[in-house]
Amino acid sequence: MDQNGASGSRPNRLSQGKEAYACERSATVSAAADRSNIINEMAKICEADRQTSAIARRTQVHERLAVANSDFVAVEDLILAYAEPTPEDQVEMIMRDFCSSPTYEEDEDEPSYESEPWFRFRNKRIRTYSRKRDPKSYMAVRTEKSSGTSGLSVQRDLNTSSTSVACDFDAASSQKIHEVLLNLSQYFSATAKASSPTPVPSQIDLPTEARQDSGDECFNAEVENLRDDLLQNGFTFEASIYDNEHEQEDSGKFNVCSDADSTPKKTDVEIAEHKKHLKGPTQAEHVGKEENTNFILEGIPLSEWLTPMEPPKISKDVIKNIPDKKVKLEPSSQKEQKSSKDSNESKIRAASCDITKKNEGTTVLDQPNAAQQENLSNDGDLLEEFLFNEWHPMQCSNGPSTSNDAIKVPKEEINSIKRNDEEQPEKETPNKSRSTSSHQLSFRKTFLKFIEISGEMKIKGEKFVEKVVSGLHHPSHKCNLRTEEYSDNHSQVMESTQRVEFKSALSKPIELLDEKETYDMLAKVEVGEINGKCSPLNNETIAEPEFCGFRTASNKAIPISEKMKIKTAEFMAEFQSKETNHQNDYLVNQPNDNSTSVGRDTAFKKSIEISEEMPTKASKLVVVDTTLGEPHQPKIDPVCSDLNESQFFGFRTASNKAIEITEAMEKRGAMFLAQSRATDQQAEWQPSDFPDIPHTSPKNEIHSINVENTKAVHTKTASETEFFGFRTASNKGIVISENTKKKVAQFMSEFQAADASTDSNKPIVISEESRNIAAKFVDEAATEDSPNKPTFCNVQSQENPLDIEHFKHDLFVERSAKEEHPLCSQPLVRTPRRSQEIHSSLSQLAGQSPLDQATKKSVIARRNLLSLKRKRKIVSSTETSTSCASPAMERFAPKPSSTSTPLADRDLNRSKDCAKNRQDAEDMSPICMQPKKSRRLGLSRSRY
């Protein structure tokens, strides 16, 4: 059954596949037919378009043959006339704009793989203004890279330009540079053998001529520069420096001293002379090499050496030889000067420098020959050019020694030097005539600048040295010589006619009034200094006379001229007169029972103790008349009495000009003094605002004070209660008009208890008598300070004594009533009580404002408008009007000041002062008062 099922299913599958294939074939055929149909349709459309365009062209050609009789232009004509440019035209325009500059370069070769259109700047390159690179530099880098096979570890950056690129060398110079680098590499490889345990083998193929000591390459350039500097400064070379004539040891170590140390090239004559002194085959070989020496490093500065170099460490055992020749440096101007006599120090140094052998820690001096004697004389000449303090200890050896052992010199050599020195005669001081034959000692400002020394200076120097030497052994003789010399100088100064001059800081001569006194003073000062230095009593204290003058910070006495004494006398006289006036005032103000001591006080009112020496010192400077009768005319010192000028005692301006004092000024001064004393006493005895009469004087006695006037002003009695006027800050009287007098009279009448009327509504009637009294009182109080008007001391006039007494009696009655009834002592006429809705600041404005009446009324009207025209509630009753216990304040009582729009003094943090709980309008100003939200009828609105 399975086979039958399988056989039955197979044809079914084939039939299904055939059907599917037929469907797909039909679909492809239909799709191809559709495509062919679309192509045919498109071809038909294109053909139709072609035919229509051809027809249009034919018709257009026919129409153009006709004459245009209208301004009509077809669209096709516009399109043909204004056709867009092709991209090639645009590229040409851009090329003309951007590529016309000479710095523009274009590559002709174009890649073939690019297709049009390509970017128009594909092969375009615009050059900047930089340095043009040399095409040869690439070749130089390649050659360096290929030839750099040496053992030097020089790292180069191929991206940066090397030195060979920066400067073009020829073949010879580049070859020299390479040889130098190879020599340096050999030097470092040779020095590394001793330090490193495993030396690296050298792979450098060096030329035969380059195998020389390392000192030639290390020091040649430095020596050349030193030679040029010395030749420019005027120095010459007579011999070469230490030559490199030592043997090279088997250990491979090198010495620092070499042939390169010699500054100039050796001539043939020098080489021939040098060969005579050589001993050994190695030295001859070095001389032969020296002739063919090539200065490889000549012309290359040290700054271009990239590798730092350090000389190798050399032990003292290797160096055993020292050259015979020495070098001598001296200025060319003194080249021919030679001396046959040397000093002891120069011989010792020359002997110590001639050490040639060192055996078992001791040194032996060679026997001096002719060449060494010549060297000794040359060294003596060289050492004479330097000062003694510029000499430095030196040790001459075959090379740089690190030991600090002293060099032993045999005693026989030193004794022979001393004997030769004793046999030689003493040196004489060189003069200008002998300057050509011997070296002269000189002083130098800098290394090459010398100070010229004249013959007089040399003679003075010799005398000074002799005095110093003699003074070291005989100090008493030295002191006597100095005293004799100073006395001779003093006699020469007194006898000579030469003028002694003093110069200021700007080198200007100062004129001397008395030249003789100046000579005497200088001689005394010099003799005093000599006596002070030479006297045996220097250690003992000598009592100097006490100086009672003034001294500077350096303890120099200040001379006091006659003008200074006169000014001091004037000042002391004025000071004494002021002091006596203050003492008199103090005595007047003090009670008679207590006795006061007159003296000087400090700023803290502490008495100054005056000793007995202080008056004597003061009397030596200034003599002051202490009499009180004429304090402005002091007695001047008799020294100043012979002056013809009249002395001025007064006031002066800032430019020291005298101020003339007129009679009016004197009167005003007297008035001011009397007023100040009266006010002081009034403030001390009765410190009340108004003049009071003491309770202990029932008869109204008037106390008076005697005032002294120094300028013919008679003393007058002034009472305590005289002055009632007004003055400015400069103590000038204020003129009071009639209107002001009436107001003052009205003001004063309010304080008088005329009638004991209890009716508060009854108007007050001011009598004519009280008005006259007040007016006269004000007239007298407001008088100006002029010589035509009487002074305030005479306020108690003789015309109206009864009026003044009556006024004082009224004041006394009023004050006695206040003391008996303190509660009823308020004035009867008061302002109405303040309303509970008006702030105190507005009441202050009404009472204390300096405005006139009209302005006050306008301000009050404005206040009423802002407060909604609330009327003031006058709370009054018979009890408050009749009784004296009214809590209201007086009209003119002092009140606290406030701002224009004050607020109530409240604390917002407290609950009772919060705005929610506050409902009274008196807590705020009427300007800032909140409106009351009450129910209103009709169309009325709130003003806020």
Swiss-Prot record:
Residues 838-852, 876-885 have a biased composition (Polar residues). One of its GO terms (cellular component) is nucleus. Disulfide bonds: none annotated. It comes from the Eukaryota. The keyword Isomerase does not apply. Residues 325-354, 415-440, 823-854, 876-944 are annotated as: Disordered. The keyword Repeat applies. Interacts with Rad9 and spn-A/Rad51. This is Breast cancer type 2 susceptibility protein homolog. It comes from Drosophila simulans (Fruit fly).
